[in-house]
């Protein structure tokens, strides 16, 4: 029976959500390729998109512009669709340093990476879900446009097993090795199998606690069970099971032979070219590196950096479009680009950055020219692969507006909150004026955000406010994600009342306690004072019923004019709706713990660091290490990778000191 998308929520669509849902669904059903949802801050865009997915019943790819945002969307969508496959597909590197060469200093930087096992599992879970069911939503970062193995090969190499099927046990073991599973009878983990007489246990790459137990009777599969890998408890009897490859870069043996021949051919051509041009060092370098890789591929079926040979492994011609996650979706699927004003330019930029770095490696003999084909999609290729797209943003960019002139608006907030009124005040005397406004807000137990243009001005203003007795903090680019979360939490808790920063547009700054946003130097045109940036900044005051924005400027620039008019337009729509329906705006009541998933991040490292490792007894140190390791794994499971990375660093320090 085909599974359907179904939303589980205590809420029903409110305000202009029903109209937005209806228009988007109508557009998709009538075959529109591109649509724009202009959703003001706090209007419930994710809920609207969830309802659209439920209505159109199509597999959906939701693209976010960074891992943090992808994690937030994944959590929200998982809550709305608990009975469907909501998957997470982001880069699986906790830390990634691509290989690079700096000719000026003759420095080669080896690729260095730490793969997060949990994310790797989630990636496998995402791709296998697409082949097993239709009710799939994958939340991905923009890195999903990077090359992945061939979906046909991935599908064809699935090991399909049924009860009663005739199959020799050793044949199954060979098939598992072909799809990159390793035999390990002692350390049984993801991507391995173990053998005990007539029983084969397989730990699929997409699971983290369950394994599949295959029991043979002679040359026949007698029984298939799903088992807890740790306790051995039988969880379910299965009639059929599909074991997906343990790597996205899998290749059949016969294809591997052809690929190796083609790589050797390319190497010979490249060596001739380099030697003819007198580049003897480069020629020696490329020969040594490539021959080593070829030997590994012959013996082991893979090598480090095998993705650089992906063009040969998939037998594609030079310059051909690489396979990506988009190719794993069926033809009729939906893409939702969240915060499209940032995501779209990011997709555009990825190809050029990647090619510039790889070209240097090719020129200096570190890689064969075919490595240039292991790349992200160009923007045109991305466009070709998309079926139907919804661009979602509070401030859609020029590209989205050009592609879909008819914009679907979602302006009304379910809470009745209005876009804030805007005052324009002269720059002369701005600090004294601002001080008076801050004191008014402090008296009402409300908070203030101030955005400046330069680091120096932020620092000077912070120092001045501290000198006059204001509790203030300063947010800048060097503040790590975890500290940033802690600062936002302290602002909400009232440990300080004013937050000063340059770019206050990043996610996580929707703080209901903020009733004043002050924009200094609002008339200095630039990317931080463009119409989009100004509208986004103004939105920071739209979570509080007393929200207000003050722009300090001596003239009204074009960007200011557009932002002010747009805010007024939205406010009048919201006021009319509230009046008609008798709604009184109410500040969002949001528990402080809701702002961040890692609230403990602010507290717990202090308890860990309170006793220096040197003063701990051996037992205390072991206990602390065990506790931290458990918490690190929990944080990674909860997709709170910043917290997990911080704990990893603390653990390394603790072990080093011990």
Swiss-Prot record:
Keywords: ATP-binding, Cytoplasm, DNA damage, DNA excision, DNA repair, Excision nuclease, Nucleotide-binding, SOS response. A motif (Beta-hairpin) lies at residues 92-115. Its main location: cytoplasm. It comes from the Bacteria. Pfam families: Helicase_C, ResIII, UVR, UvrB, UvrB_inter. Residues 26-413 form the Helicase ATP-binding domain. Residues 430-596 form the Helicase C-terminal domain. InterPro entries: Helicase/UvrB_N, Helicase_ATP-bd, Helicase_C-like, P-loop_NTPase, UVR_dom, UVR_dom_sf, UvrB, UvrB_inter. This is UvrABC system protein B. The lineage of its organism: Bacteria, Bacillati, Bacillota, Bacilli, Bacillales. The gene is uvrB.
